[in-house]
């Protein structure tokens, strides 16, 4: 609207409609200045309101897309979310997961603001590469690399790793082709799981842009759990904890996690301001560590396929649901 073409009387009428006061009736320039200022304020307010509505819409849309883990991970919780989902806070600022692993709850929740971390550098390179929009490079590698025993051991033992992309490519290939998706390293830090003998492997998730969208808006770190507790200690944040279980096996090849680490984690869990939800295997030691924080437990039955094709005996365990809020 060009105010200069209006008469003083018309401008005064506009001022009255907009409830503008403090002008001189005979000073046309003063009235025009006031009207322009009000218009600018109104436009800024409208832009802000549109932005806020858009942000709320994005969050709602994001949370309706439940993704599945990209890779297999020992102890993954994809089939168990139904047992503890109702304990998750309805509102929080940042989703935190310091033992991301396969990230079952993270991908399922599809949070708008998240920080995920793990001390496993190959895993972090994989998530980072996908978040950077380079999943097509991993897809090409999968297409060009045969799923056979000779190639598997060549990739596992001889592939030259000189950057995060080649690291991610090898890691993803191994996760898809190794026996039972297991993760184990020898004393020299070399991956030592045998070939899986799968007739077909599915890597189409790499073409799903929803993974890239989620990971691109996530801060992806290769840090210890202590670092996450220390740097995101806010009561408005939510942390999901799926740590290594309390067992005789404590050396994962890429990290050590025994009784000492479990005790350190429990101490941080009890002292932090962060709303923490943990799911972990039930043992006497864990029960004692978290005796005042256990809110639920459920049964989990495992049955593993053996390397010769036979199916092993069913293993019955219990998982504890623990929270500090």
Predicted segment positions?
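Short active-site oxyanion
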Residues: 91-94, 112-113, 215-219, 270-276
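Basic helix-extension-helix modules of the SAP/HeH family
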Residues: 1-53
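Long, positively charged, glycine-interspersed low-complexity recognition regions
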Residues: 258-325
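Short, Lys/Arg-rich amphipathic segments at extreme N-termini
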Residues: 10-15, 63-103
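Short loop/helix-cap segments at secondary-structure boundaries that form the rim of catalytic
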Residues: 106-111, 212, 231-234, 286-292
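Short, polar loop motifs at secondary-structure junctions
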Residues: 99-104, 206-207, 280-284
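SAM-dependent nucleic-acid methyltransferase catalytic core
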Residues: 58-80, 86, 131-240, 244-250, ...
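SAM cofactor-binding core of SAM-dependent methyltransferases
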Residues: 86, 93-157
């Amino acid at each position: 609207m060009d105010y200069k073409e209006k008469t003083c009387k018309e401008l005064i009428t506009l001022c009255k409609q907009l409830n503008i006061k403090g002008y001189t009736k005979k000073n046309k320039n003063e009235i025009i200045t006031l009207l322009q200022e009000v218009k600018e304020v109104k436009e800024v307010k409208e832009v802000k309101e549109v932005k806020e509505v858009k942000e709320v819409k994005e969050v709602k849309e994001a949370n309706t897309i439940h993704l599945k883990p990209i890779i297999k991970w020992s102890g993954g919780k994809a089939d168990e979310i139904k047992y503890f989902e109702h304990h998750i806070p309805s509102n929080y600022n940042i989703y935190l997961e310091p033992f991301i692993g396969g990230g079952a709850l993270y991908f399922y929740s599809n949070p708008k603001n998240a920080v995920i971390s793990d001390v496993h550098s190959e895993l972090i390179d994989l998530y980072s590469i996908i978040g950077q929009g380079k999943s097509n490079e991993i897809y090409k590698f999968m297409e060009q690399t045969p799923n056979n025993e000779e190639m598997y051991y060549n990739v596992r033992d001889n592939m030259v790793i000189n950057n995060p992309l080649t690291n991610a490519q090898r890691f993803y290939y191994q996760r898809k082709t190794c026996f039972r998706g297991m993760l184990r390293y020898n004393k020299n830090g070399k991956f030592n799981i045998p070939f899986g003998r799968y007739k077909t492997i599915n890597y189409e998730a790499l073409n799903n842009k929803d993974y890239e969208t989620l990971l691109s808006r996530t801060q992806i770190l290769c840090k210890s759990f202590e670092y996450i507790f220390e740097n995101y200690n806010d009561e408005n944040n939510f942390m999901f904890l799926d740590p290594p279980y309390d067992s005789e096996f404590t050396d994962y090849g890429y990290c050590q996690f025994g009784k000492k680490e479990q005790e350190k984690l429990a101490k941080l869990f009890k002292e932090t301001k962060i709303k923490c939800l943990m799911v972990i295997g039930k043992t006497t030691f864990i029960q004692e560590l978290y005796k005042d924080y256990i809110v639920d437990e459920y049964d989990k039955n495992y049955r593993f396929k053996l390397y010769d094709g036979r199916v092993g005996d069913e293993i019955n365990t219990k998982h504890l649901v623990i929270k500090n809020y």
